[in-house]
């Protein structure tokens, strides 16, 4: 029998009524959302809304108490994070995951070894070298991680995500610790992920930073989804504007 527990005809990364509590505190309440390949989807809300817990349940770091998580119609709710990664789901955590003692190039090589992939078979047209070029890292490939700027670290982390050829990626606060100029560069790279038919779910404490790259947006408050729509609808909603966009 395969590892998957159930199948459906649906595609996409899908959460169905996922719920989680900590110490009798209901943190996430029956959240449902969908990320299709080739789309960028935003998840916004104030601190404590439950966004990171949702990311944890989607990635497998946190177990959902109820509900279901599916990748292309296959339930992965009871599968650990490394099995979900094999199913095509990768997570970029909020805290940097760069190996500070290794060079940029070696960070990518280690990722390749961890995913049991061959470096000559990764990247847009086949190699780690292409990832270095794609993410503007070629000229600093020998620089160790501890000497990278916040923006360079994020670009390296995005490049490492592609080593495993994911179908879906979760980006948790990808602009944290990044200067405004680098934020714009990273936005371009995130949009390029969707252009490569990867589904992206992104959250950030500053909703205005991600609305311009999203196709669809979910708004969370007190552990529940309270609004869903395209960026224009989100930006036009008075409650969303006052609470989340600071207008």
Across the structure, where does each feature detected by a protein language model lie?
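The feature captures the beta-strand-to-loop junction immediately N-terminal to the Walker
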Residues: 44-46
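Helix-to-loop junction immediately C-terminal to a conserved catalytic motif
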Residues: 59
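Conserved ABC ATPase "signature" region
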Residues: 121-140, 187-191, 239
